[in-house]
Amino acid sequence: MSISDDISPVPPAPVSEPNAGQDAGQDAAPAHMAARAEALRDQLNYHSHRYYVLDDAEISDAEYDALFRELQDIEAEWPSLRTPDSPTHRVGDTVVAALETQAHTLRMYSLDNAFSAEEWDGFIQRMLRAEPDAPTAFWCDPKMDGLALEVIYENGVFTTALTRGDGEKGEIVTTAMRTVRNLPLRLHGEGPHPARLEVRGEVVITRAEFDALNAARRGAGEKLFANPRNAAAGSVRQLDASVTAGRPLRFLAYGVGQVVWPAETSDGAASAAQGPEARWATHGQVMAALADYGFGTPPDARRCETPAQVMAYYEDLGRRRSELPFDIDGVVAKLDDLSAQAALGYTARAPRWAIALKFPAHQATTRLEHIAIQVGRTGVLTPVAELAPVAVGGVTVSRATLHNEDEIRAKDLRVGDMVVVQRAGDVIPEVVRPLVDQRPASGLPEFEFPAECPVCHTPVRREPGEAAWRCVNVGCPAVVRQSIIHFVSKAGLDIQGVGRRWVELLVDRGKVTSPADLFGLDKQTLLAFERMGPKLAENFIAAFDTARTGATLNRLICALGIRHVGEQTARTLAAHFADLDALGAAQAETLQQLPDIGPEVAASIRAFFANEGNRALLERLRGVGLWPVRPVRPEADAAGAPGEGSGPLAGLRVLFTGSLTTLTRSDAERRAVAAGANILGSVSKKLDLLVVGDKPGSKLDKATKLGIRVLREQEFLDLLEGRGGDVPEDGDGAPGNEDEAPEVSADVPAAPEVLADAPAAISADASSGVAPGVSGGPDRADMTDRTVRTDSVDAPAMPRKKDQHSLL
């Protein structure tokens, strides 16, 4: 099946035979050999384009290989003839030491999402309010589920490839992308080409090629990829380009970034204009030009003249999504008129002229075989459904979080039930409901939540008003393991290069039983581990030293994992207490005088410092020199200065709860602070505004009882952008009450394969202190198993009601 509109590039002239008897020892390549190399490059690039982009090969593989080997031989004899656009770069003979980053010239924005027809209508209305005369024709294409990437061309030659990264800067993956067969190394077609062209798109793998890739890995005894997206991402981010070259990757272009045109056009007229709109009027024209330049483009893309046609396209594509060669999770609709795009501009995170219309979640039916219990770093016991493996939207799902006991009771889930499973937002596995009519006539027993921790067998406790049961033993092996992982994480001390798997390995081997042990590790101890080389061991020790000497008080407070104390509360505490001695001596009454600390948080802080084991840990940290005495520097943490400025949330005290779909919790808090808000850590009468995501839990109940105003996530974003008017009255727009979401969330498909020195995944055993069938905490790679190809369920028409956002 062709993956782009059929275009017919003019084939290069046939390659002539070389002259016999040429002296290969000359330093300078003879002119006729240089001409031959150029002809070979043109011929190979032409046939690669016909094969990989147009699916219309003109020569056999053997003929192509003969031309390719001939060019390799010429370049080996005369290296000066190897040009940047030579097809021989695609063999991937380069290894880079590490992936460096580079800033994008123009930011790569995210897209806002629409999950219902009403949200699509709301997007249109917001757009027309901002620009009443904007045309409403849209360019629509499938939302490819791959790795977003930017490829850069200077004077028609490919020079740089960057991952999307955080939108501001991305990782440089130029060497790997040179091996992607359908990516033009030199722009095709007649000029003039842009002097600089930034092309944006997705790196994808077809489902058929993904199945073949996993079959080969299975035969070789290698770990299987979870899904095509993870395979694509892991392949592009390889340090060894020869690995990338062996993967069936394709780059599909969906737009452009910066475009700089030559100073003069082909007819000699001066042209100082820059940007795509200097030569193209519509996005459709941009896509046609990219196809002419030699790029593959998303299949089934089209122009829709009205918003109603967009919805018809969305519903049609949803019904046919299983017929497409690639995984997709929705439709991207972009205003087709480029001048209207420029007039509408961007919000802080997304264009105002484009949106992603997401498909409803895939669903499937399977059996609930067991309910296992995970123990997290604060002792939370999280039930996890162990399922008979089932294909859901192209991924085999065998586990899904059940959040807490109340959710099990509310859904009446029982071991042995046939259940409906979905991937919310096509990503997060979720058990939707049991099929009660399929239970045996004799019935099934209700699930009994354990009365003791399955790891250390300490009695568990559930506090009034909370949804979670907790192990209260701070020495529980599972709690210790997860606490150390949190200690080194980005939310803790952010110890660079020391990831979750290394911590698990250190704990499992008994080398680390406390965060303080990390700072006593020496090179000899580290070198005893497989795949730990001298340089990596030195990097680890240097990272621990940097954390020990450079940690700020607020980071250490957060790293300690005090219950209810997150990043913002840690900043508040660090700004008011000189060191941990002063904080530990503070009485509850003193703590409650601080801006975001109520009785519950104050009691938790007091309980932490009263615990004998915690006091022993603090003394050990003091002994290794990890004892910051300075408050967080305002210039180093500007986001921590709450309540300042004149933004839309100026002076308001805000709290977030539930699972946010478009932002991380940290990003949401930073944006709220930038808008003038003060972030609180718990619900109290001091709170002005509660922002709720999915499964907001008991915080919503408390806020409702206290008459605190509530906003949905999208309403919060609208308010930040000046689109939402005033903060709504009490409870307006709040979703239905749900139990407190536990700290262990539903897991997503396995992360891309490890790129640098890192150990293989560590399985739980007796040495880890984790009971059989029980995890010492969430391993996001475990929730979704290996991918199998499956035909997806036809997507129904988008519902006409205002649904809560699914997790992405």
Curated annotation (Swiss-Prot):
Keywords: DNA damage, DNA repair, DNA replication, Ligase, Magnesium, Manganese, Metal-binding, NAD, Zinc. InterPro entries: BRCT_dom (IPR001357), BRCT_dom_sf (IPR036420), DisA/LigA_HHH (IPR041663), DNA_ligase (IPR001679), DNA_ligase_CS (IPR033136), DNAligase_adenylation (IPR013839), DNAligase_N (IPR013840), Hlx-hairpin-Hlx_DNA-bd_motif (IPR003583). Its cofactor is Mg(2+); Mn(2+). GO terms for cellular component: cytosol. It comes from the Bacteria. Its EC number is 6.5.1.2. Pfam families: BRCT, DNA_ligase_aden, DNA_ligase_OB, DNA_ligase_ZBD, HHH_2, HHH_5, Nlig-Ia. It catalyses: NAD(+) + (deoxyribonucleotide)n-3'-hydroxyl + 5'-phospho-(deoxyribonucleotide)m = (deoxyribonucleotide)n+m + AMP + beta-nicotinamide D-nucleotide. NAD(+) binds at residues 61-65, 110-111, 141, 164, 202, 334, 358. GO terms for molecular function: DNA binding; DNA ligase (NAD+) activity; metal ion binding. GO terms for biological process: DNA repair; DNA replication. Gene3D superfamilies: 5' to 3' exonuclease, C-terminal subdomain, 6.20.10.30, BRCT domain, DNA ligase/mRNA capping enzyme, Helix hairpin bin, Nucleic acid-binding proteins. Coiled coil: none annotated. The keyword Magnesium applies. DNA ligase that catalyzes the formation of phosphodiester linkages between 5'-phosphoryl and 3'-hydroxyl groups in double-stranded DNA using NAD as a coenzyme and as the energy source for the reaction. It is essential for DNA replication and repair of damaged DNA. This is DNA ligase. It comes from Nitratidesulfovibrio vulgaris (strain DSM 19637 / Miyazaki F) (Desulfovibrio vulgaris). The gene is ligA.
